[in-house]
Amino acid sequence: EDFDSQCVPTADPGPCKAYIPMWWYNVLS
């Protein structure tokens, strides 16, 4: 998946800025 490549678990405001919180939510659940 390109998800990890484009939406890294950092505070970097990348192209997936809106997906960052969702990514963390998924990891923490």
Swiss-Prot record:
Transmembrane segment boundaries: none
UniProt keyword annotations, A-Z: Disulfide bond, Protease inhibitor, Serine protease inhibitor
Domain BPTI/Kunitz inhibitor: 6-26
Recorded GO MF terms: serine-type endopeptidase inhibitor activity
Keyword match Calcium: no
InterPro entries: Kunitz_BPTI_sf
Signal peptide extent: none
Keyword Nucleus: no
Biological function: Serine protease inhibitor. Inhibits trypsin, elastase, plasmin and kallikrein.
Record protein name field: Kunitz-type serine protease inhibitor RsTIQ7
